[in-house]
A protein has these predicted regions:
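Beta-strand-centric surfaces of beta-sandwich/beta-rich domains
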Residues: 1-283
Length: 283
């Protein structure tokens, strides 16, 4: 086993670009950790975090084979499922503060899965692509401060165990709507499924309001593995994965401002500095 820097705190020369990192073409990659940092503007960065800096993270093999392709909120939620706790991050909305987030990319069931991993030698080209485009402003992000670090968990000089496959995570469907009704999604059938994630967000709307029920149907209802209310499905996920949906945030707000933690259920709230938060902030 070896933990390797593939990129170490590289400051990006552009404020809007795609960082392409060539990955090793030998040995085995179990997990990649992508750390992105950015400095807030000279005034503040209210309602912003690193998810607003990064647009998409991808791992592409041989130019077109998609092994990983998620937006930061999706990668964040998968990390919550994989580890049962939030990803490593720093949220600090005050002026000239360095925020960061670490997005995990697992090619197996766990960080060091001996059976599911990425066999680098099977590819002639292997790229990690990080698309970023922070808004440059005094009330957003400072120019020239996007910094990227990539760490790989690898097995060197041989296979860690019997190879059974590579787990990939990709977005297969996304949409925006103001209408109510049923949304039918045809799932691709080329590969086996291990797990699916349904993510829905509307600013100012309580979890479980927009999506009320989820059904998985096989062969036109020949088999129905589940047909559950959204709230019940969320409760089952909590039991299965022991999810701790918590975020630590240093926020810059007036007394009556609203703070969106973007977690399904608030697990607790601590006011670290009442002179900053005020006594009547709405959470």
């Amino acid at each position: 086993r070896q933990i390797r820097y593939l990129l170490d705190s590289e400051v990006q020369s552009s404020d809007d670009a795609t960082k392409i990192l060539k990955l090793p073409l030998s040995n085995v990659i179990h997990t990649l950790y992508v750390k992105v940092e950015c400095t807030t503007g000279s005034t503040s960065a209210q309602d912003l975090d690193i998810d607003d800096v990064v647009d998409k993270i991808e791992v592409i093999g041989n130019g077109s084979e998609v092994l990983f392709s998620l937006t930061p909120p999706e990668a964040r939620l998968y990390g919550l499922l994989d580890f049962g706790q939030p990803i490593a991050e720093k949220v600090d909305e005050t002026a000239n503060a360095v925020m960061f987030a670490v997005y995990p990319i697992l090619f197996g069931r766990t960080e060091w899965d001996p059976n599911f991993w990425l066999p680098c030698s099977k590819f002639t080209d292997l790229e990690l692509r990080i698309k970023y485009s922070p808004t440059i402003a005094a009330t957003a992000w400072a120019t020239g401060t996007v910094t990227i670090t990539v760490i790989a968990l690898m097995t060197m000089g041989g296979d860690p165990g019997q190879y059974m496959g590579t787990l990939r995570k990709t977005t297969i469907y996304d949409f925006t709507t103001v209408a109510s009704g049923d949304e039918v999604i045809d799932l691709p059938r080329r590969l086996l499924y291990r797990r699916g994630l349904i993510y829905c967000y509307e600013s100012g709307t309580e979890d479980g309001t927009d999506i009320t029920k989820v059904k998985l149907s096989l062969n036109n209802d020949e088999r129905i593995p589940f047909n559950l209310e959204w709230a019940d499905l969320a409760d089952l996920n909590q039991l299965l994965y022991d999810i701790k949906a918590e975020r630590a945030m240093k926020i810059y707000r007036a007394d009556t401002d609203v703070v969106y933690t973007i977690t399904a259920e608030g697990q607790g709230l601590g006011l670290l500095n009442e002179t900053m938060f005020g006594g009547e902030a709405q959470i």
